[in-house]
């Protein structure tokens, strides 16, 4: 008798998408994704696993009317381990119990001027199963997106991007101060706000390049 188990993904910690305008309606789309390299599986999309298999990192670009304009895959550039927070008071007891890896992806696309602009969307399931303030986090996916404004807003634009990585762990009961600053190549003023993370796909369908349901994740108090 052969028994099969669905290859679920329980690894996503976070991510961001940003872009640079190259001229001639060409944009370099960049994405960083973070995974738990202790409690989570599988490896990053776009990179080979231990058997040489590669799951493509699909993304889709939509116009403001939800029409898919480009469906493609990111080029996997590099991945590395995020250094731990060595100056944390609980670092000696936490060392070896926390591990986060960062993957970098890029893709150059041509996007003609379009009123309203475009949305670049990447979806993947699932989030880290150790999350405490989500119901069944190991079956909750993630959606990351970036908006490229249309010509009625600006003729050419580069998006902001975060400057510092957040610490991979914080100490229970100890306040944290972290400078989550971003920079903008155009020198634009930046406004920061907190929002609900977006859900995306589930354990039954962990990866697909279709119209993404950008819905906030269901939360519970803890």
List each model region and its residues.
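Long, compositionally biased, intrinsically disordered segments
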Residues: 7-222
């Amino acid at each position: 008798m052969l028994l099969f188990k669905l290859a679920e993904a329980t690894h996503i910690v976070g991510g961001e998408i940003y872009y640079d305008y190259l001229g001639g309606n060409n944009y370099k789309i960049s994405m960083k994704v973070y995974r738990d390299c202790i409690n989570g599986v599988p490896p990053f999309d776009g990179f080979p696993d231990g058997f040489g298999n590669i799951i493509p990192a699909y993304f889709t670009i939509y116009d403001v009317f939800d029409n898919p304009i480009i469906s493609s895959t990111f080029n996997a550039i590099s991945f590395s381990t995020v250094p731990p927070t060595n100056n944390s008071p609980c670092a000696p007891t936490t060392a070896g119990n926390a591990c986060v890896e960062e993957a970098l992806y890029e893709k150059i696309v041509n996007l003609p001027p379009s009123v309203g602009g475009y949305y670049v969307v990447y979806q993947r399931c699932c989030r880290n199963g150790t999350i405490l303030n989500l119901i069944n986090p190991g079956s909750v996916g993630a959606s990351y997106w970036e908006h490229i404004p249309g010509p009625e807003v600006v003729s050419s634009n580069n998006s902001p991007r975060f400057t510092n990585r957040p610490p991979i762990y914080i100490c229970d009961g100890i306040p944290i101060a972290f400078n989550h600053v971003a920079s903008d190549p155009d020198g634009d003023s930046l406004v920061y706000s907190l929002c609900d993370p977006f859900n995306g796909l589930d354990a039954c369908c962990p990866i697909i390049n279709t119209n993404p349901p950008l819905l906030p994740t269901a939360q519970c108090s803890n």
